[in-house]
């Protein structure tokens, strides 16, 4: 709720759950926290790799994130603004780090992070969860990527 308020206070629109029982956005947001990534385009791209290689999930549940109406609208706006070339530049800049996540970091984990995690995890220390799952987050240097600037950018 704090992040949602932050977005609203700064003229941004928070995503809304598909229905009142859904925890999809909470689960996605928690994955940013557990893997130590912000919400920039570059770090969203890195998070995709963590999710695919370092998480346990049902593909249909994970894929339902792309069906959120606000995300579809955001994707259209982004494509219109930066174009396909901008997306290629984005992925070109993150590929080395994505490979490190896929072939080094995620393989060293003790067990996969459950994307749809139990509610009780929200009451635990992040450092304890990272230790339990063997999650080693990227260093600031590893996350220092060339950023795509667009109107939806915001500092985190």
Regions found by a protein language model. Give the residues of each.
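Long, solvent-exposed, polar/charged low-complexity segments
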Residues: 96-156
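Core of folded catalytic or high-affinity ligand/protein-binding domains
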Residues: 1-121
């Amino acid at each position: 709720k704090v992040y949602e308020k932050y977005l609203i206070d700064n003229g941004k629109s928070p995503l809304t759950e598909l229905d009142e029982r859904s925890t999809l956005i909470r689960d996605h947001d928690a994955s940013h926290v557990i893997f130590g990534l912000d919400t920039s385009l570059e770090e969203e791209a890195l998070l995709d790799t963590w999710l695919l290689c370092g998480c346990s999930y049902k593909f249909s549940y994970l894929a339902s994130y792309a069906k959120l109406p606000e995300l579809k609208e955001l994707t259209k706006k982004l494509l219109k603004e930066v174009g396909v070339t901008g997306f290629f530049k984005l992925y070109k800049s993150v590929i080395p780090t994505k490979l490190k996540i896929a072939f080094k970091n995620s393989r060293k984990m003790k067990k996969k992070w459950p994307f749809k995690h139990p509610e009780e995890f929200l009451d635990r220390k992040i450092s304890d969860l990272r230790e339990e799952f063997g999650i080693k987050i990227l260093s600031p240097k590893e996350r220092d990527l060339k950023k795509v600037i667009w109107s939806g950018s915001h500092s985190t």
